[in-house]
Design a protein with these regions (language model features):
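Active-site neighborhoods and metal-handling regions in enzymes and metal-associated proteins
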Residues: 1-114
Length: 114
């Protein structure tokens, strides 16, 4: 996880690497998590709702046998490192804050195996 501050604004970025011989179950978890991130990004369109993002992520994760970590979530970024809104990785389509053009937030899906 890496963050920089530029002209008073924060960033938040991360990368994950698998090193050595990774158990197939762990590789699958990593692959599905990346798929969920991509699905969440696709759902995060102007005029959609944050619940649309969470629902899309949750549906794909559960379809693949994983459960969503509900205690941690994505978040807004700006002049503070963690700002509103909370971007949960579960939810109901059509609920939550409306996504407006220009909003900046993270999508950080995390799952339990099982």
């Amino acid at each position: 996880d890496v963050s920089t501050i530029y002209n008073g604004y924060f960033s938040d970025a991360s990368r994950m690497f698998m090193i050595g011989n990774v158990h197939p179950a762990i590789k699958r978890l990593v692959d599905v998590t990346k798929e969920c991130l991509e699905i969440g990004i696709q759902a995060a369109q102007p005029w959609a709702r944050l619940g649309d993002v969470g629902a899309a992520i949750q549906q794909h994760a559960e379809k693949n046998g994983y459960s969503v970590v509900r205690e941690l979530c994505g978040h807004g970024v700006g002049i503070k490192f963690h700002e509103e809104p909370d971007v949960e990785h579960f939810g109901r389509k059509g609920t939550g804050m409306m996504i407006l053009p220009g909003m900046t937030f993270t999508i950080e899906p995390m799952f339990f195996m099982g």
